[in-house]
Amino acid sequence: MIIQRTGAGTQGAVNAVNATHLLLCSLTNAHATALYARKLAESAEGLVTLLPTAAFEDSYQDEDDVCADYLEALLQERDDAAEVLAGGIAYLHAIERFQWFEPDTSDAPLADVAAILATDCFNFAMVGTRKQWRDITYVDVEKRYL
């Protein structure tokens, strides 16, 4: 059995209990997620709520916020979506967001930075379904290709 737990993402998905549809997103599938969410919103006349899940006490923005800003620009079909993304990534570098990542550490390997910032690599949305197993609530995720 493998249990994946991130500090924020999986907890945010489980705690979004009032969501009619649950989509999980990172920069790697932001464009596909925006397209999928827009179709859902149009067909159901629904509202799209973005929930960047990481929270830091000093309230600086992190990659979750950058992803949410980029996703919002894509959802609104703004012409400056690429600039929003570039500005967010520049901000992350300016605040030295990845300064603790090191080449030979398993907790925060330097190689992960490229993966964190990789954008629009996949053409699928990740659709979550809330499930229960005994006393454990979790989100089962399925790829939906566009």
Question: What kind of feature is each model-predicted range?
Answer:
Residues M1-D58:
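Internal, conserved structured core segments that host functional sites
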Residues M1, G7, A16, T20-H21, ...:
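Long, charged alpha-helical interface segments
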